[in-house]
Amino acid sequence: MWANPSSAQTLQERVPGLSADELQQLRSEGSIRFHTEDQPMQFRYLPHSSLSARVRDSFRGLEPNAVNEVLYLLPKPHTDGDLLLHIYNTLRAISTLSGVRYHSGHYDRERVLFDDVYAMDSPRSRNRIDDPLVTRVPRESSFPVHLVDANFGSSYFEATYYGAGDAVSFGLRNTQSLTYIIPVIRSERLRFQLLAIPLEEELLLYGTVGVEAGRLIRRQVHLPSAFRRRIETLADWFIEQAY
């Protein structure tokens, strides 16, 4: 299911920041993870692609308290048509995020992480619209999104997409403060990115999240765990939908 040794050179070229141990783990287990606290974004696992600079730029101005990175090596999805279009529309089918679950150690059971997720016509009117699927991959596109987060409740984000000949990306950033009893994460201080890069026989899926949070939530919540859960859930959602 995972990469074979013949793909090693491609991986090393695509992700030169990987150590030998990380490369071996990625080949054998299919994924690796990394996090930092109170450090700038490192993009340690970010693969080379035409969109990698866009991913970096999306975090400009952020001074994160916690950063999580994940990298998956997956089989290439089977599709009768354009693979990049299939990946792109999978990421644009934002309503399918509704009801995604994670295992809560605190409650020792499965919980819904994101619910009532939908695209909107504009940030002002906030009318629900159908998933804005496309027939070709544009270079850039964005639309507002509503979602209910298990901890932060009803929230508003902007979803941004980029397309290129070798990759597609999907980003989310909050457009209003997120509340945990009181506002704890200011507008645009929570940012996610997924980057999908087809290889010859596999698919690289990179994900990262950076959060700049207030003192209250940092005292009450272990940020690396909380936001690792969210970026992994986004990646798992894509994988489930794409395959």
Task: Give the label of every model feature segment.
Residues 139-141, 166-174, 205-207:
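A short hydrophobic beta-strand element
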Residues 151-152, 156-193:
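Hydrophobic-ligand binding "helix-grip"
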Residues 181-185, 211-230:
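A short acidic/glycine-rich loop-to-helix N-cap element
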Residues 223-243:
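Surface-exposed amphipathic alpha-helical segments
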Residues 10-150:
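Hydrophobic ligand-binding cavity/cleft-lining segments
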Residues 3-5:
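N-terminal signal peptide c-region/cleavage motif recognized by signal peptidases
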Residues 192-222:
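A short, solvent-exposed beta-edge/loop patch
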